[in-house]
């Protein structure tokens, strides 16, 4: 859907806006972007911030001081969606006394609700789905012309035309595939993110080369289902396989000078291949950290979720990773209290957590989402069961995480310093190759001082469930 309104009551046909060239009008106002949800949303927000700065906007010191407020929203769980409406209500009240304020809702709630958002919050100026992030300037031009705009049509995503305003100068998100073609029965992502659209390997490498030239040292390749990268691109190899896969992309970008670390997320067990595992082992810049959601440790629940794999397949993936890379970190996502989940099936999930020994786990109790099959089923579990199972799950996750981190005590780990610890300015914080958050002093042996962007060898002397602390060793690789 693509609509713009001269007022909340009058419809103006402007569907051609999607192909209009961006304007060059300069704005003197300020903006504030609030991001909810996943890494894809964070990357989209960086892109939109870059567009706004190119238009002449500057970032406001606080949300309530901004001339343009943009909420980049998430609908994967109900509590995230309700939080957005709370923020919007506050800004809608503000706009009644500050009519110059531009109020924008982007992301998945915008895609899901569309024009209904205008009826619920008539103070909105722009409602735009995630496929329109790169069209922000053209859409705001319509707003400047006095129209309310809804942009939720299923569009080909424009190649990145504007330099993103990165929230870090060390680590960068790089979108490589948008959308998702899976049909998991609980998930709203395909209906709000659209079908899979892979960027070309050439465009991705060009972006990464630009990041390296600006001093970035780590990149994370992003996709809702990153293992599906390239299956919508043309080309077959003489061996009969797809010419463009995530494995091929890793080889294609690996030699970009200046980039020290490469990560990727999020993987799907159904498409996680032996060839990909071997590439991660062979390519030294690819970090030994794999985010592979398993969602449930019970095959019947996985079938009801339409996940397309079994617990046995998941085990084989984990075993092969650890066979080649024994110290690799594996993180995951888990949903408990899915409709119809029995006590025994829940216990199977806990058993798999114990068996694998995950390093990090994103946990959630099932939340019915609009336009998903599971939301219509009659075997929904009581809220009390959801709360209790999530409580048990989180307790186990924390215990396992502490056990896994305890293995690092006394060891020396290479840490990429990402910034100052906001709670202790005398400390830097960064991550190991296995994605452990690590804190250490800004000053090392013999008065050596470290800065964000340095690769520092840290001797770990304190472990917690979700972070490490340590002391710098002499060896360091400066960013400069």
Swiss-Prot record:
<comment type="subunit">
    <text>Monomer.</text>
</comment>
<dbReference type="InterPro" id="IPR023404">
    <property type="entry name" value="rSAM_horseshoe"/>
</dbReference>
<feature type="domain" description="TRAM">
    <location>
        <begin position="406"/>
        <end position="474"/>
    </location>
</feature>
<dbReference type="InterPro" id="IPR013848">
    <property type="entry name" value="Methylthiotransferase_N"/>
</dbReference>
<feature type="binding site">
    <location>
        <position position="38"/>
    </location>
    <ligand>
        <name>[4Fe-4S] cluster 1</name>
    </ligand>
</feature>
<dbReference type="Pfam" id="PF00919">
    <property type="entry name" value="UPF0004"/>
</dbReference>
<dbReference type="Pfam" id="PF01938">
    <property type="entry name" value="TRAM"/>
</dbReference>
<keyword id="KW-0411">Iron-sulfur</keyword>
<keyword id="KW-0949">S-adenosyl-L-methionine</keyword>
<feature type="binding site">
    <location>
        <position position="180"/>
    </location>
    <ligand>
        <name>[4Fe-4S] cluster 2</name>
    </ligand>
</feature>
<feature type="domain" description="Radical SAM core">
    <location>
        <begin position="166"/>
        <end position="403"/>
    </location>
</feature>
<dbReference type="Pfam" id="PF04055">
    <property type="entry name" value="Radical_SAM"/>
</dbReference>
<keyword id="KW-0963">Cytoplasm</keyword>
<dbReference type="InterPro" id="IPR038135">
    <property type="entry name" value="Methylthiotransferase_N_sf"/>
</dbReference>
<dbReference type="InterPro" id="IPR006638">
    <property type="entry name" value="Elp3/MiaA/NifB-like_rSAM"/>
</dbReference>
<dbReference type="GO" id="GO:0005737">
    <property type="term" value="C:cytoplasm"/>
</dbReference>
<keyword id="KW-0808">Transferase</keyword>
<feature type="domain" description="MTTase N-terminal">
    <location>
        <begin position="29"/>
        <end position="145"/>
    </location>
</feature>
<protein>
    <recommendedName>
        <fullName>tRNA-2-methylthio-N(6)-dimethylallyladenosine synthase</fullName>
        <ecNumber>2.8.4.3</ecNumber>
    </recommendedName>
</protein>
<dbReference type="InterPro" id="IPR002792">
    <property type="entry name" value="TRAM_dom"/>
</dbReference>
<dbReference type="GO" id="GO:0046872">
    <property type="term" value="F:metal ion binding"/>
</dbReference>
<dbReference type="GO" id="GO:0035596">
    <property type="term" value="F:methylthiotransferase activity"/>
</dbReference>
<dbReference type="InterPro" id="IPR005839">
    <property type="entry name" value="Methylthiotransferase"/>
</dbReference>
<feature type="binding site">
    <location>
        <position position="184"/>
    </location>
    <ligand>
        <name>[4Fe-4S] cluster 2</name>
    </ligand>
</feature>
<comment type="function">
    <text>Catalyzes the methylthiolation of N6-(dimethylallyl)adenosine (i(6)A), leading to the formation of 2-methylthio-N6-(dimethylallyl)adenosine (ms(2)i(6)A) at position 37 in tRNAs that read codons beginning with uridine.</text>
</comment>
<keyword id="KW-0479">Metal-binding</keyword>
<keyword id="KW-0004">4Fe-4S</keyword>
<dbReference type="GO" id="GO:0035600">
    <property type="term" value="P:tRNA methylthiolation"/>
</dbReference>
<feature type="binding site">
    <location>
        <position position="74"/>
    </location>
    <ligand>
        <name>[4Fe-4S] cluster 1</name>
    </ligand>
</feature>
<feature type="binding site">
    <location>
        <position position="187"/>
    </location>
    <ligand>
        <name>[4Fe-4S] cluster 2</name>
    </ligand>
</feature>
<dbReference type="InterPro" id="IPR006463">
    <property type="entry name" value="MiaB_methiolase"/>
</dbReference>
<dbReference type="InterPro" id="IPR007197">
    <property type="entry name" value="rSAM"/>
</dbReference>
<comment type="similarity">
    <text>Belongs to the methylthiotransferase family. MiaB subfamily.</text>
</comment>
<keyword id="KW-0819">tRNA processing</keyword>
<feature type="binding site">
    <location>
        <position position="108"/>
    </location>
    <ligand>
        <name>[4Fe-4S] cluster 1</name>
    </ligand>
</feature>
<dbReference type="GO" id="GO:0051539">
    <property type="term" value="F:4 iron, 4 sulfur cluster binding"/>
</dbReference>
<dbReference type="InterPro" id="IPR020612">
    <property type="entry name" value="Methylthiotransferase_CS"/>
</dbReference>
<keyword id="KW-0408">Iron</keyword>
């Amino acid at each position: 859907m693509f609509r713009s309104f001269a007022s909340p009551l009058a419809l103006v046909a402007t569907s051609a806006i999607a192909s209009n060239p961006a304007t060059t009008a300069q704005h003197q106002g300020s903006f504030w972007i609030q991001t909810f949800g996943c890494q894809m949303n964070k990357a989209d927000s960086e892109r939109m911030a870059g567009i706004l700065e190119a238009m002449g906007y500057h970032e406001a010191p606080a949300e309530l001081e901004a001339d343009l407020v943009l909420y980049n929203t998430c609908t994967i769980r109900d509590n995230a969606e309700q939080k957005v409406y709370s923020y919007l209500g506050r800004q809608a009240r503000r706009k009644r006394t500050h009519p110059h304020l531009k109020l924008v809702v982007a992301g998945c709630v915008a895609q899901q609700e569309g024009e209904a958002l205008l009826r619920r919050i008539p103070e909105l100026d722009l409602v735009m789905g995630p496929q329109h992030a790169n069209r922000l300037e053209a859409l705001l031009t319509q707003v400047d012309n006095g129209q309310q705009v809804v942009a939720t049509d299923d569009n080909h995503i424009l190649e990145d035309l504007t330099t993103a305003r990165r929230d870090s100068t060390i680590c960068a998100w790089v979108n490589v595939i948008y959308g998702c073609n899976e049909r998991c029965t609980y998930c709203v992502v395909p209906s709000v993110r659209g079908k899979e659209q892979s960027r070309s390997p050439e465009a991705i490498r060009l972006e990464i080369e630009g990041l390296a030239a600006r001093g970035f040292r780590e990149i994370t390749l992003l996709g809702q289902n990153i293992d599906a990268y390239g299956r919508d691109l043309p080309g077959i190899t003489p061996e009969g396989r797809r010419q463009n896969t995530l494995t091929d992309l890793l080889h294609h970008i690996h030699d970009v000078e200046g980039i020290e670390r490469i990560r990727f997320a999020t993987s799907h067990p159904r498409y996680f291949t032996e060839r990909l595992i071997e590439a991660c082992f062979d390519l030294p810049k690819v970090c030994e950290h794999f985010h592979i959601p398993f969602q449930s440790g019970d095959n019947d629940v996985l079938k009801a979720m339409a996940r397309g794999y079994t617990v046995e397949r998941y085990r084989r993936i984990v075993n092969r990773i650890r066979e080649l890379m024994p110290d690799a970190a594996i993180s995951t996502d888990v949903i408990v209290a899915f409709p119809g989940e029995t006590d025994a099936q829940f216990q199977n999930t806990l058993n798999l957590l114990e068996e694998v020994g995950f390093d990090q786990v994103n946990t959630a109790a099932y939340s019915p989402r609009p336009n998903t099959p599971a939301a219509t089923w009659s075997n929904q579990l009581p809220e009390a069961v959801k709360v209790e199972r999530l409580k048990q799950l989180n307790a186990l996750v924390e215990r396992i995480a502490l056990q896994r981190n305890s293995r690092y005590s006394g060891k020396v780990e290479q840490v990429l310093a990402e910034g100052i610890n906001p709670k202790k300015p005398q400390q830097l914080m960064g991550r190991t190759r296995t994605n452990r958050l690590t804190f250490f002093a800004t000053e090392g042996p013999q008065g050596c001082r470290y800065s964000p962007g340095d690769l520092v060898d840290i001797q770990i002397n304190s472990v917690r469930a979700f972070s490490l602390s340590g002391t710098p060793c002499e060896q360091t690789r400066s960013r400069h």
